Amino acid sequence: MAVRPAALAMLLALGACLSCAAEPRLGVFYFPGWRNDTPGAPSDRPWEPIKAFPDRQPRLGWYDEGQTSVMEQHLSWMAAHHISYVVFDYYWAGRPILAHAVQAYQASRGRQKVQYALMWANHDDTRPRTLSEFDGMVADVIDQHLRRAEYLKVQGRSVLMVMVPGFLEARTQALGLAPGALLQRLQQGVRQAGLPELMILAGAGAALNEVTRQARRWGYAGYFAYNYHAGVDGRTRGEMRASRSYLELDEDYRSHWEWFLGQADLPYVLPLTSGWDMRPWGGSADKQHDQSISTPAEFTLHLQAARKLMLAHPAKTLGLGVVCCWNEFGEGSFIEPTQGYGARHLEAVKAVFGAPASGSPP
């Protein structure tokens, strides 16, 4: 019987993701913003605003991020609680900045148990300013990261996330290039280095928008999200607003999951959240949005729903989920053990993602 090309592609994807179905993998985003006097950090003394919220004090204390001993403990906790990989926020300002945390990872023994990937946090819509600057970033990513054995691969391809695809495409056009040309240039650099093409994921929200319409054309292989604040089309419970409780935020995330798994043209790494409460950094525009931080019990239900979808859709999710975040203390998105919350959120991860894949979620 002849197999149509589209059907063949889906069969190949399903075959490649059989291991995903057997063992869904959960990762976590890591914000490298907790070292004094570091260009790119929230301030010269980034811990100071957090100290007004003593329940958020890390169990390790107000540490100097970038020390290998700190990263060793982080990785030990991750591995012990079934976090398979960590995604470091990657910043480029003509040179890498806030790279101290990933460098500590690379120097640690724990990297053997927890893989890593990069998310290019391209908040700056003026970068790259030139092709040579972009080429410098490509060289840094290749030489400092993609050649490493512990870098996260899916179907044999290293995973790179781009937080704001629209900004990158705007810079592509500003440099006088065709749509998707910077991503093509990145892939060309990777091939010339003798490495397999990247699996580049686009940060996106649900519904038809510029990113979900153009991602495949631009050269992306799938979608992800760092975080969401509302549901599909910016609505929470039918109103144009952000969530005002974790229950609402969980509902909002599930609405994005449903849309992507049902309608998106590319795979979708399932995003999860421990919550949102930005009061240490001045608070959200809608103050009630800062009531969206989770209890361990609420977070457990969120994890269970995500795991169920990852098991049901191994090809569409690539068998991957990623939590925001390990340590976004200023935004209230963290699962790193703290004085006030202990390790209860991590224990929830272990309870849910440590369960046998062949069984029902706990």
Task: Describe the residue ranges of each PLM region.
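Glycan-processing catalytic domains of CAZymes
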Residues: 21-362
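Positively charged n-region of N-terminal signal peptides that target proteins for export
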Residues: 1-5
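Bacterial N-terminal signal peptides
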Residues: 7-17
